[in-house]
Amino acid sequence: MIKSCYIHIPFCKKICSYCDFCKNYYNELVVDNYLDNLKKEISKNYKNEVLDTLYIGGGTPSSLSKNNLNKLIYILKTFKLNQDYEYTFECNYEDINEELLDLLKNNKVNRISIGIQTFNDKFSKVLNRDINKKEMIEKINLTKKYFSNINIDLMYALPGESINDLKMDLEIIKKLDVTHISTYALIIEDHTNLKLQNIKETEDDIQNKMYYLIVDYLKNNGYNHYELSNFAKENYESRHNLTYWNNDNYYGFGAGASGFIDNIRYDNTKSVFKYNYGKTGVYEEKLSLNELMKDEVMLSLRKINGINKDVFYKKYNILL
């Protein structure tokens, strides 16, 4: 049974130097056409299941114009949601204002994820991000007036970042008291601007020190370390991301989206051009029983609680 859905909105006003996700510079006509094709893909494949989680990611979904944001919201009303649902919308802090928050709240969104990465403006140039600590804090506090469930993305092991730099970010996060933190070490992927600039990743021993600093700091300040990279206040774990780590079925719609349905993993094209011409899928793989069990184990080991032996037996009729 499918209880989760991911929607990819691959448009940004500015491309971060580290980003390896499917993304394109914002163009109103291209976005308008993209949303038309997104609606077609959903209409063709969604079977009216009642969903527990819906996640709108990118790219930068909040970068859409008012008209296209309303168009997206209308398309998303296609999905039926459980009474106890989780509906996440990713935002760039610069896009956040009362009008946006009001629109999202009035259309069933109940969780906001803000891609902060760092509050330290000395990394603006190398990350190709506009970093304004004062505005970031103001926008997060504004979001808290509308939503009780907020995630912040924190990136560490940035080029030239010190332990003290990271501590400063963590101290700000502590004061903001949001419900969820996702943390990621910077990985310099091929075909990114950082790779082209020949920037090197932070040494492993420093990365490890930073990781354990984050773990200890957040655990000591009321966060449950429930997955390798994720921390949550009690009862605020990301139910959508747990869908992935529990190896459960989920839809993936939009260019660059992936899904897992009836033992088949699939990836959509990363080309918005191809997607807008109706050429959505590029890859499908039907997994064998052994492959399914292997994935179950590997994904479960990302969770701090590890493998649920009862669930594994129920799925595969095999005792661990």
Predicted feature residues:
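C-terminal scaffold of the Radical SAM
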Residues: 2, 24-44, 52-318
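Local cysteine-cluster metal-coordination motifs and their immediate loop/turn environment
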Residues: 10-23
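Immediate flanking context of iron-sulfur cluster ligation sites
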Residues: 1-9
